[in-house]
Each structure stands twice: as C-alpha cells, then as structure tokens.
C-alpha cells in the first residue's frame, strides 16, 4: 500500500497523544528516511516518537483507522532497508521506549523497552550479558533485534534473538496490546508470542518491550584470526572442526581478502597478518584451556592471537567493520 499525506486533523490528533515535539514532519524527518549505509532512502509524511506502550497503541489505532501504512523503526542500524519508509509510510520510531527493569537474580532475566540498546541491556548486570552480540550494539535496539531475529557474533553459542526471549509486549495494528512478559521458560498456555514475533519484521505487531534471558559473561575469552590459504573451503572445514573440538567456542566468523582490502583502503585498518590470504576465520573461545584448544585446531597456519580486551577488539574490528565496506562502495 503506497504512502500518502497525513491529513492535518490527524496530525493534530497524533500530536495530542505524543506532544507536538514528537510528531516530526518536513526536514526534521531526514535522519529517519535512510539506512545506515545510505544505500536505501525513502520519504515519509511524518515520524512519530512515542515514549510509552499506551502511546504506541493510540497512534496505531489512529493510523489504522485512517488506512495509513506504518514502518516501525528501532536504532535504524539495519543494512537492508527494513526500517526505511521506501513507499512513503509513516515512521514509528521506538527509540524513546527506554525503560530497563532490574535484573531478576533468580532467573537471570531482565525486561527492556524496545528502545533500549543491546549495549545498555548487556550492562544491566556485571556478571551477565546479552547472548546476541552485534557490531552496532551501542545503537541497535532490543525491539529491532527482536523484529529481525538478530543473530550476531555469538549465535553459535547462544542462538539468535529468538533464543534469548522469555516474553514480549507488543501492539497490533489496531492498537490492541499483547501482554506476555511473565518470563516462564516452559509456558504452554497459548501461542508462543515471543517466537512468533521474533523475525516478523513488524508485519504482525510492533514490539514495545521484551523479557530477555541473560547469559553468564564469558570468562577469559581468547580471540584468534587465522589465515585460510585454500579459501572458503578451508574456512568451512576449520569452523566445523571448531564446533566439534573447542568446548568453549563462542564465535566463528569469516571474512575474505576483497572485503578486507576495502576496509584497509578506506577505514584506516592495517593488514592483520604479514601476508594476505584468500579468506580468514575469526574464532573466539572462553574458559579453561581455550587457548590450548584453539592452538590444537589451528596447527601451523598463520594466526594472530589476542587475549587482552583491547587486542581482541582490534581483531574483531576486521569483522565488525565489514558492513562499512558496503557503504564505501556506494549505492548498488
């Protein structure tokens, strides 16, 4: 359904719900109509910025009644245009839903508003972490991660966002609020709303809060970047072996030399190893014996090893900054 102008009377009704400062039009919408890479750009008649679930419900009821399409938007860190109003939709920004409850020490769970960043949720308890770790964690939001079923760098260990969910609160297009934040691990009382909404990209409902199962923060992680002289086939074999033989494996991510060349040329990174290779594998493991386990797997292949946090961050930059390569290459 193509977007259309929002009638002035409806804009006034929306402003009555949200406050005039949180109904943006004209030039004030510029930051909401393009994705992080600038490869996708749209237009919108208005950006709505609710702060509470009841406001989300009220504005969706108004827009649904007027037949006006909506695109929900979280931190706008996506790379494929999913949160961009490509057809002139109204943008519903969830960035102001930033409530973050205390961590339940018995269950290790926390309830976070859709606008809470993944980094903020991960910092809720010094001994616990969010299982989904992505490069944009300082800007990416809980609601967006649920809507996209984000995977991240530790998906091998902890699964995607769906696996972290113990409950959701969401609003249907007509303004009906779904409350399912109880946090029971085994709950057969009805539809599994967390699983249904994870990955639904805003097509079923707008997620306004999520109850997350936190995971123990990894102890003594070790990161290695290994050169694969035989390319992706060797990377695949190494990754499969790592899953079988490294008990503390947290991550296995690959990158290729062409992508690395773009980063070296445009982002100021230096080559990770003295000689180039067709492909590379980054592995991270934690716990007792992690370094020995990784060493046994790698053998005599060229490798960079990092144990200190700053050194590990430098190695991960080669993977985490890889989406920048798409931006450097310009529109498709």
Protein language model regions, located:
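FAD-binding subdomain of flavoenzyme oxidoreductases
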Residues: 99-106, 110-253
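Short hydrophobic alpha-helical runs that function as membrane-insertion/retention elements
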Residues: 71-72, 132
């Amino acid at each position: 359904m193509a977007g259309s102008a929002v009638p002035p009377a409806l804009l006034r009704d929306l402003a009555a719900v949200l406050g005039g400062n949180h109904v943006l039009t004209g030039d004030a919408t510029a930051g909401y109509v393009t994705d992080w890479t600038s490869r996708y750009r749209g237009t919108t008649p208005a950006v709505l910025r609710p702060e509470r679930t009841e406001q989300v419900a009220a504005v969706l009821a108004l827009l649904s009644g007027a037949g006006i399409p909506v695109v929900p938007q979280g931190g706008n860190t996506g790379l494929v245009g999913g949160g961009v109003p490509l057809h002139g939709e109204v943008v519903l920004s969830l960035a102001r839903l930033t409530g973050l409850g205390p961590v339940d020490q018995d269950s290790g769970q926390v309830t976070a508003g859709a606008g809470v960043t993944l980094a903020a949720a991960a910092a809720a308890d010094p001994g616990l972490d969010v299982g989904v770790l992505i490069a944009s964690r300082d800007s990416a939001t809980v609601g967006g991660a649920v809507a996209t079923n984000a995977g991240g760098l530790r998906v091998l260990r902890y699964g995607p966002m769906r696996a972290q969910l113990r409950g959701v609160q969401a609003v249907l297009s007509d303004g009906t609020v779904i409350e399912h934040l109880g946090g029971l691990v085994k709950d057969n009382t009805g539809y599994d709303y967390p699983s249904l909404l994870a990955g639904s990209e805003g097509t079923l409902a707008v997620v306004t809060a999520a109850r997350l199962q936190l995971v123990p923060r990894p102890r003594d992680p070790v990161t290695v970047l290994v050169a694969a002289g035989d390319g992706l086939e060797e990377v695949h074999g190494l990754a499969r072996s790592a899953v079988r033989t490294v008990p503390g494996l947290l991550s296995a991510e690959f990158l290729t030399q062409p992508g690395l060349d773009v980063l070296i040329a445009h982002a100021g990174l230096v080559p990770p190893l003295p000689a180039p290779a067709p492909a590379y594998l980054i592995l991270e493991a934690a716990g007792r014996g992690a370094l020995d386990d990784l060493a046994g797997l790698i053998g005599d292949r060229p490798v960079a090893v990092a144990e200190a946090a700053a050194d590990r961050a430098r190695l991960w930059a080669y993977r985490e900054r890889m989406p920048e390569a798409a931006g450097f290459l310009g529109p498709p």
